[in-house]
């Protein structure tokens, strides 16, 4: 731009000098012309031509310094990519953008009602080493209903570590002899589990794993589980646990180790509980679009023939309402579908609906 201005100024100065030189020689000729029209034409010939040259040169100089408009590529602002939170990050509020208020109830484990739950073998006379065998309930039917309600609420945010949250949760699972009219449809067993959970998010820099897997969080907790019944049907235990969760796209894995808090003598309703249900719990989740799938395996690795696996499949009743009612299919095989059945092996399948998810 500066070169263009300098060039224009130099051209103007040169033309001005030429104009002055021409005028000095010819002005006297014009002045001596007596005819008015001829004298005017003489002046126009001298000064008009110079003015035209100056105008054209000035325009050329301006063209030289004309600023070309920027192209779209030069003016385009490249936006920085925005990270999209994964399902796990949203569920546990692992990023600052996903944090929500405290003391608001949200779903924890699946909330469902399975009116048709069929087992291969109903536990009519539960027993344990310290409680003996209960009186048999001969009228119990292999087809019953299964209900679970599970909620959680965040108690503290940024607790002890950056981004870490303290949660409280309560879960209740019932086996209801809904189709047993002979015994007035009793509840065969209900398990209650309050717990405290400490969730610590793991940053991307520390959580990278091979194959694009990412460690998302560490979890620590303490829980009490019992069925609230009197002896000899009483079952209960306390535990602390630790684990971690990883994900990759629509897949997630959660591992947890449960350490039972020991009890003494007759206070222990079920001293061999861990031998049957196991201390390790691994859950694999798959979210392929509208459907969800979760496979949970529990085992102690000391008794591979024990433990259990459970498969949960859901699909929305109305695809336009993803958080509404969902069809729920559940399959179970092994020990410990309920606390009362911790040492009782069975295979079961249940069909119903997931009640709510928020």
Regions found by a protein language model. Name each.
Residues 51-183, 190-195:
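Outer-membrane beta-barrel initiation region
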Residues 44-47, 200, 353-358:
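Short beta-strand-to-coil "C-cap" segments at the C-terminal boundary of structured domains/repeats
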Residues 1-85:
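Cleavable N-terminal export/targeting peptides
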Residues 144, 148-150, 193-195, 241, ...:
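Membrane-embedded beta-strand positions in outer-membrane beta-barrel channels/transporters
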Residues 47-53, 328, 335-339, 350-352:
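A cross-kingdom marker for long, charged
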Residues 280-338, 355-357:
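Long, repeat-rich segments with strong aromatic
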Residues 123-134, 141, 156-286, 295-299, ...:
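Outer-membrane pore/translocation modules
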Residues 193, 329, 346-358:
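Outer-membrane beta-barrel "beta-signal"
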């Amino acid at each position: 731009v500066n070169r263009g201005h300098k060039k224009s100024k130099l051209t103007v100065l040169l033309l001005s000098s030429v104009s002055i030189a021409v005028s000095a020689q010819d002005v006297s000729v014009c002045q001596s012309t007596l005819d008015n029209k001829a004298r005017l034409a003489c002046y126009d010939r001298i000064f008009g031509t110079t003015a035209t040259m100056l105008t054209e040169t000035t325009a050329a100089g301006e063209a030289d310094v004309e600023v070309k408009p920027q192209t779209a590529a030069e003016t385009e602002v490249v936006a920085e990519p925005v990270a999209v939170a994964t399902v796990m990050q949203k569920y546990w509020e692992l990023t600052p953008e996903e944090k929500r208020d405290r003391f608001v109830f949200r779903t924890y484990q699946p909330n469902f009602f399975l009116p048709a739950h069929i087992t291969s073998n109903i536990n009519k006379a539960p027993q344990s080493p310290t409680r003996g065998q209960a009186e048999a309930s001969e009228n119990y039917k292999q087809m019953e209903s299964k209900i679970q309600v599970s909620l959680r609420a965040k108690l503290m945010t940024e607790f002890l570590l950056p981004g870490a949250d303290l949660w409280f949760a309560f879960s209740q699972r019932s086996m209801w002899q809904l189709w047993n009219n002979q015994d007035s449809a009793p509840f065969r067993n209900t398990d209650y589990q309050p717990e405290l959970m400490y969730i610590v998010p793991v940053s991307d820099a520390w959580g990278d794993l091979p194959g694009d897997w990412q460690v998302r969080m560490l979890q620590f907790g303490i829980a009490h589980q019992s069925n609230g019944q009197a002896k000899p049907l009483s079952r209960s235990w306390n535990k602390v646990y630790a684990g971690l969760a990883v994900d990759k796209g629509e897949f997630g894995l959660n591992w947890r180790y449960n350490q039972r808090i020991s009890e003494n003598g007759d206070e222990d309703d079920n001293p061999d509980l861990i031998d049957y249900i196991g201390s390790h719990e691994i859950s694999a989740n798959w979210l392929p679009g509208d459907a969800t799938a979760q496979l949970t395996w529990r085992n102690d690795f000391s008794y591979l023939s024990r433990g259990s696996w459970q498969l949960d499949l859901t699909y929305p009743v109305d695809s336009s309402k993803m958080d509404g009612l969902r069809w729920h299919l559940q399959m179970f095989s092994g020990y410990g579908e309920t606390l009362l059945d911790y040492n009782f092996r069975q295979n079961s399948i249940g069909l119903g609906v997931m009640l709510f998810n928020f």
